[in-house]
């Protein structure tokens, strides 16, 4: 059986991930006109720029959908977002600012839940709006086939017939109007935006040029913290975790994690927290650039890692960061539910997150400018009295440290001998100032 269909399967049921925008609206109508039987599936991911989800399936039926369903994915999305925080599953960072993999998390949830809904309806062909140059085409491919082994893939944007007839947004708009729908193109922005409850991605068009900065972006989850005319008063916020799970913000508990994440977004968003500019490597190894928002994820991540550093030992923290980066890359590649990812997730959640209980108080200012005001946990291994500089009882004495210095550093003689050995072989040059060999000046290399 062919997995990827290059042309429209006339007379067959096709499920399309339907956003209600021009692209998917025109594609659905075109498929119906050409003799396919389209079904529309819309994921409610709590997009901050979507105000009427119920209207989307109605529009799909107007455009010819045989059936249209709205799938509430918010609970599962937040659950996966919290799991990513517990595991530190983030591998793209620039200057200490993190991309929280919010789009890959959204694709993991959308790709599995929509295809599961299609399977319930006897729909085994899936189409979506991803292009062949991006990451999503592979993410959806993997998650779709993982959920339904009999799935076939049909993407109008890979069909030469569709491209020849409706290759651009202007052609799509004219097609909709010609079919009796008064569909006006929205005003073109200088970039494209994709969002869910966890975060927003701004990319493409003007943002493909590195001399276009965050200043051309209108945040949809935060504020223009770079604009000095925007008043942003400082704000204290307390975040509480129990066994790795965020349970309270400013002492307030929530009926469910969705409400908690919405409140975290509101708090962080008031300051522009979690906004970053990243150059990243796509799955196909080409570099792309995105500007990201994730105010709630950033707030929870900061508090979580503060507790982490106060509770766990150095080796555990090192493994958390190493495995978290590895897991983040798997998530980015559409492998969040693969066995190698599940192994890392289980280890990090079981042995790291389970001990993260406590409260962190922060002062948020502008953008990613914040201070940690207090850290409280019964699980802290940080003990001020162990290293106090004041007189009093101590867990060890000066004599103890003398012994430690002697035993811990017996290799100094070995290291000195190696340095002189490197000098004799020409890897290092002699230094008259210190008496020890030193790394040769690269400018003199080969002279």
Swiss-Prot record:
InterPro entries linked to this entry: Arg_succ_synth_type2_subfam (IPR023437), Arginosuc_syn_C (IPR048268), Arginosuc_syn_N (IPR048267), Arginosuc_synth (IPR001518), Arginosuc_synth_CS (IPR018223), Arginosuc_synth_type_1_subfam (IPR023434), AS_cat/multimer_dom_body (IPR024074), AS_multimer_C_tail (IPR024073)
EC annotation from Swiss-Prot or TrEMBL: 6.3.4.5
CDD domains the UniProt entry points to: ASS (cd01999)
Binding site for ATP: 17-25, 43, 129, 131, 136, 194
Pathway of action: Amino-acid biosynthesis; L-arginine biosynthesis; L-arginine from L-ornithine and carbamoyl phosphate: step 2/3
Gene Ontology molecular function: argininosuccinate synthase activity; ATP binding; protein homodimerization activity
Enzyme class, spelled out: ligase
Assembly description: Homotetramer.
Record family assignment: Belongs to the argininosuccinate synthase family. Type 2 subfamily.
Name the record gives this protein: Argininosuccinate synthase
Lineage, highest ranks first: Bacteria, Pseudomonadati, Pseudomonadota, Gammaproteobacteria, Enterobacterales
């Amino acid at each position: 059986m062919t997995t990827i269909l290059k042309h429209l399967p006339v007379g067959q049921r096709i499920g399309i991930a339907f956003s209600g925008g021009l692209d998917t609206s025109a594609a659905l109508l075109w498929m119906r006109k050409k003799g396919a039987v389209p079904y529309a599936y819309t994921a409610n991911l709590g997009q901050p720029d979507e105000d009427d989800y119920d209207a989307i399936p109605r529009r799909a039926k107007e455009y010819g959908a045989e059936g249209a369903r709205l799938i509430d994915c918010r609970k599962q999305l937040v659950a996966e977002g919290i799991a990513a925080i517990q595991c530190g599953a983030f591998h793209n960072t620039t200057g200490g600012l993190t991309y929280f993999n919010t789009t890959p998390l959204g694709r993991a949830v959308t790709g599995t839940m929509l295809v599961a809904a299609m399977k319930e309806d006897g729909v085994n062909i899936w189409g979506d709006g991803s292009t062949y140059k991006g990451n999503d085409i592979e993410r959806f491919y993997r998650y779709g086939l993982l959920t339904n082994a009999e799935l076939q893939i049909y993407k109008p944007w890979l069909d030469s017939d569709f491209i020849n007839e409706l290759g651009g947004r202007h052609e799509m708009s004219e097609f909709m109007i010609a079919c009796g729908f008064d569909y006006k193109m929205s005003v073109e922005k200088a970039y494209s935006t994709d969002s869910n409850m966890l975060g927003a991605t701004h990319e493409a068009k003007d943002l493909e040029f590195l001399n276009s900065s965050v200043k051309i972006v209108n945040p949809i989850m935060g504020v223009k913290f770079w604009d000095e005319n925007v008043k942003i008063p400082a704000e204290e916020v307390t975040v509480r975790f129990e066994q790795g799970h965020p349970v309270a913000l400013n002492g307030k508990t929530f009926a469910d994690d969705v409400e908690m994440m919405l409140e975290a977004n509101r708090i962080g968003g008031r300051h522009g927290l979690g906004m970053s500019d990243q150059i990243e490597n796509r799955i196909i190894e080409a570099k792309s650039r995105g500007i990201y928002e994730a105010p709630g994820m950033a707030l929870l991540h900061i508090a979580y890692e503060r507790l982490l550093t106060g509770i766990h030992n150095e080796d555990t923290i090192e493994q958390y960061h190493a495995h978290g980066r590895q897991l983040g890359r798997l998530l980015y590649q559409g492998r969040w539910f693969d066995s190698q990812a599940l192994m890392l997730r289980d280890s990090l959640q079981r042995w790291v997150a389970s001990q993260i209980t406590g409260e962190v108080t922060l002062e948020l200012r502008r953008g990613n400018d914040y201070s940690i005001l207090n850290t409280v946990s019964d699980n802290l291994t940080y003990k001020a009295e162990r290293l106090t500089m004041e007189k009093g009882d101590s867990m060890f004495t000066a004599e103890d440290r003398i012994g430690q210095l002697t035993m811990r550093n017996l290799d100094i003689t070995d290291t000195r001998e190696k340095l002189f050995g490197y000098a004799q072989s020409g890897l290092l040059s002699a230094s008259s100032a210190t008496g020890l060999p030193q790394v040769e000046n690269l400018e003199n290399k080969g002279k």
